């Protein structure tokens, strides 16, 4: 997979990378059916995001839409932005260092988020691949993924996520119970790296049959 880690100056280049990212995740079974959504910050502060209800392994440029910081379409489009656009907008508002966001629905993330919903978090520790996360320098550190209740009140969920991130930095991602993983990075390249690292650790935890 080829990504450039760009400054996201143009829609055309970002759309191409989001299409490639979507296909990358779909091929690994992380976005079954039409699940998942992906976005990146554009140079003017608006966001390019995948349209709602589209299979992520077969996206075209028309399946990428542009929204403003509040999640509203910036121009006429036959496509609708993802129903979870507000969750993407929350992350970009939370930190100017976030340049791309990914939401996947892998088997491991779905199962473990259900298993750990009552505890409220999934703890991943002792995995060497954790050092792929930006700022992580040792495998002995613990990666804490909060688990939020799956709700259709996306605005309220975004508020809950923002409060957790403010109270417990650094946060590398979070889970929605029975739903999947949200993670992010400074650009698409780092976001891909974070997806792979976290999904790998979740796979390992699932195979191990439990979490401490």
Curated annotation (Swiss-Prot):
Q: Can the keyword Amino-acid biosynthesis be found in this entry's annotation? A: yes
Chain residues that bind Zn(2+):
103, 105
User: How many cofactor units bind, and how?
Assistant: Binds 1 zinc ion per subunit.
Q: In which pathway does it act?
A: Amino-acid biosynthesis; L-methionine biosynthesis via salvage pathway; L-methionine from S-methyl-5-thio-alpha-D-ribose 1-phosphate: step 2/6
Query: One Pfam match, by short name?
Result: Aldolase_II
Has UniProt tagged this entry with the keyword Nucleotide-binding?
A: no
UniProt GO MF annotations:
aldehyde-lyase activity; methylthioribulose 1-phosphate dehydratase activity; zinc ion binding
Q: Mind telling me which GO cellular component terms the entry cites? A: cytosol
Q: Which cofactor does it need?
A: Zn(2+)
Per its record, the protein catalyses: 5-(methylsulfanyl)-D-ribulose 1-phosphate = 5-methylsulfanyl-2,3-dioxopentyl phosphate + H2O
Q: Which biological processes are named by the entry's GO terms? A: L-methionine salvage from methylthioadenosine; pentose catabolic process
Q: What is this protein called?
A: Methylthioribulose-1-phosphate dehydratase
Species source reads Sorangium cellulosum (strain So ce56)
Q: Which family does it belong to?
A: Belongs to the aldolase class II family. MtnB subfamily.
Alphabetical list of InterPro entries matching this protein: Aldolase_class_II_sugar_metab (IPR050197), Aldolase_II/adducin_N (IPR001303), Aldolase_II/adducin_N_sf (IPR036409), MethylthioRu-1-P_deHdtase_MtnB (IPR017714)
Tell me which EC number(s) this protein carries.
Answer: 4.2.1.109
The enzyme's first-digit EC class, named in words, is: lyase
PANTHER family assigned to the protein according to its UniProt record, in alphabetical order: 3-OXO-TETRONATE 4-PHOSPHATE DECARBOXYLASE-RELATED, FUCULOSE PHOSPHATE ALDOLASE
């Amino acid at each position: 997979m080829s990504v450039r880690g760009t400054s996201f100056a143009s829609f055309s280049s970002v759309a191409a990378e989001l299409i490639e990212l979507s296909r990358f995740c779909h091929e690994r079974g992380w976005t079954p059916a039409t699940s998942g959504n992906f976005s990146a910050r554009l140079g003017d502060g608006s966001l390019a995001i995948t349209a709602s209800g589209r299979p992520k392994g077969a996206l075209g440029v028309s399946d990428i839409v542009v929204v403003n910081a509040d999640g509203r379409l910036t121009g006429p489009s036959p496509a609708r932005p993802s129903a979870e656009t507000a969750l993407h907008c929350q992350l970009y508002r939370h930190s100017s260092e976030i340049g791309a966001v990914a939401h996947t629905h892998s088997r491991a993330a779905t199962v473990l988020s259900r298993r750990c919903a009552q505890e409220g978090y999934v703890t991943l520790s002792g995995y060497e691949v954790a050092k792929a996360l930006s700022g992580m320098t040792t495998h002995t550190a613990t990666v804490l993924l909060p688990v939020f209740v799956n709700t259709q009140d996306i605005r309220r969920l975004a508020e809950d996520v923002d409060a957790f991130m403010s109270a417990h930095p650094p946060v590398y991602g979070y889970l929605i119970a029975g739903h999947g993983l949200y993670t992010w990075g400074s650009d698409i390249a780092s976001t891909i790296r974070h997806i792979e690292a976290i999904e790998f650790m979740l796979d390992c935890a699932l195979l191990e049959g439990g979490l401490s």
